[in-house]
Amino acid sequence: MDTNKEGARHLTKCAYLFDAVLARIPEDRWDAPTCCDGWTVKDCASHAIGVMVNLRNRALGEEPVDYQDGSWAGDNPLSSCRERLDDLVEAIQGADLDMQFNSPVLGDQILGEFYGL
């Protein structure tokens, strides 16, 4: 099986699992503290949703966003996650998984392999 396709499948599975986790968070717990000093549950969700946006942007060859600005969860983190998840899945389906790009942290990467990390 093609490693790059496996990477894309892995990312898609992980994104859907993240959605399932968010779906289990009670409405009154979004402002609860987490083990990340100074971060609420909503802050952590926003960070992960922003990362999802960047993964989509990689698939489309677009510039990365500031995934740490705290805005990605919006007023309804689950709805925001689902909207971004749909965008990510759509982008992956048409992506060139063999495309090479430069990650500021990991250096030169192949998109499909990167998705499998």
List the predicted regions and their residue ranges:
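Aromatic-glycine hotspot motif
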Residues: 1-117
